[in-house]
Amino acid sequence: MTSKNKNGFTLIETLIAVLLLAMSIAGPLTIASKGLTSTLVAKDQFIGFYLAQDAIEQVRFLRDSACLATPGDSTGCPGSAWLQGLNNCLDSVSPDGCILDSLATNPPSPAACTGGVCETMRYDATNHIFNYNPAMPLTPQKFIRTVKITNTADEAVVTVEVNWVDRAGITRVPITVRENIFRWQ
């Protein structure tokens, strides 16, 4: 019997080499994919937080405007007028909350949400702003901002909740911002 020297790889050696090569490529790609997904989630969370903060600032603006428009007495802003214009946001009037469009000219009274759901915000891609203008398209994230105010004689708790469904169709944990505002003294 004569033996021949065989050169090359066996089938098993080739399969193991291909498997190792595939794993060395798949690992970094998986990490990069997770990083990209996390970046998109963080971006949406930032937008949600700033939309909530924008609503808080709008409530403050409307409170300040109502106090400045009504002459006060020695105790400051009149107790009956300090939340004037925000009636649809009071939980005693509209338990579902309201929507505030901070970009509307001559801001109308906030609109009460109906059926337990507020209107979806729209995005103006030209000016890079969110609003409730029906002429603007819906965003892929579909942000929904709900404003609720619980008030007493001299204090109000403003709660803003921003919900959204991301580009992949996953409902994310809502952003909730609470702030106490007070009647001017």
Where are these regions (language model features)?
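Low-complexity, Gly/Pro-rich coil/beta segments used as flexible assembly/activation regions
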Residues: F46, Y50-Q185
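Aliphatic-rich helix starts adjacent to a transmembrane/signal segment
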Residues: N5, F9-Q53
